Amino acid sequence: MRNLIFFVIPFHFWLPAEGFKLNTNLLETNLINLGVVLGLLVYFGKGVLNNLLDKRKQTILSTIRDAEERYKEATDKLKQAQIRLQQAELKANEIRVNGLSEMEKEKQDLINIADEDSKRLEDSKNATIRFEEQRAIEQVRQQVSRLALERASEVLNNCLNSELHSRMIDYHIGLLKTMGSTTE
């Protein structure tokens, strides 16, 4: 019971005769108080502190694991994005090369078509020229024949009598008829 009194009654009311006295040395008193408080804290707070530290440790470890998982996911996504980028670049290069080759092919096709058109026009021009030459030659031939016949007719008219003249005319008319039927 006496021990209980010591706790209930503050120290400054205790009588110095009983063996307890008021310690006025603040340094000593604070060290003892600090020692007692620290001892009590260590004894009673050890479990609580360990519990708090374990929870904090688990929280930090789970955060680190989550961060590592997110890092792996981000790395995987980055690799996939890089692969898609490379595929897109390859596709773009393929499209560009195909476009260039297609453009070259179209260019060559246009050149070939233009050459063919030019050759056809040249052939058509040459055919037209040959046709016109043949027509001109035929006209000249007909004119020469007509003039020759007229000249021969004049010569014969002057030189021949009317009977011979009639026979010659008939002969040449027959000749012209056969000539006319072969030209048509």
Swiss-Prot record:
What coarse category fits the chief subcellular location reported for this protein?
plastid
Residue ranges spanning the membrane: these are 29-49
Alphabetical UniProt keywords: ATP synthesis, ATP-binding, CF(0), Chloroplast, Hydrogen ion transport, Ion transport, Membrane, Nucleotide-binding, Plastid, Thylakoid, Transmembrane, Transmembrane helix, Transport
> Where does the record place it?
Plastid, Chloroplast thylakoid membrane
Name the InterPro entries for this protein. ATP_synth_b/b'su_bac/chlpt
Q: Which Pfam families match?
A: ATP-synt_B
> Superkingdom of this entry's organism?
Eukaryota
Q: How does it sit in the membrane?
A: Single-pass membrane protein
Query: Care to name a GO molecular-function term for this sequence?
Result: proton-transporting ATP synthase activity, rotational mechanism
- GO cellular-component terms in the record? chloroplast thylakoid membrane; proton-transporting ATP synthase complex
Q: Does the keyword section mention Calcium? A: no
HAMAP family membership: ATP_synth_b_bprime (MF_01398)
The record makes one more remark, namely: In plastids the F-type ATPase is also known as CF(1)CF(0).
Protein purpose: F(1)F(0) ATP synthase produces ATP from ADP in the presence of a proton or sodium gradient. F-type ATPases consist of two structural domains, F(1) containing the extramembraneous catalytic core and F(0) containing the membrane proton channel, linked together by a central stalk and a peripheral stalk. During catalysis, ATP synthesis in the catalytic domain of F(1) is coupled via a rotary mechanism of the central stalk subunits to proton translocation.
Please describe the quaternary structure of this protein: F-type ATPases have 2 components, F(1) - the catalytic core - and F(0) - the membrane proton channel. F(1) has five subunits: alpha(3), beta(3), gamma(1), delta(1), epsilon(1). F(0) has four main subunits: a(1), b(1), b'(1) and c(10-14). The alpha and beta chains form an alternating ring which encloses part of the gamma chain. F(1) is attached to F(0) by a central stalk formed by the gamma and epsilon chains, while a peripheral stalk is formed by the delta, b and b' chains.
* Similarity annotation: Belongs to the ATPase B chain family.
**Cross-referenced NCBIfam families:** PRK07352.1
Put simply, this protein is called ATP synthase subunit b, chloroplastic
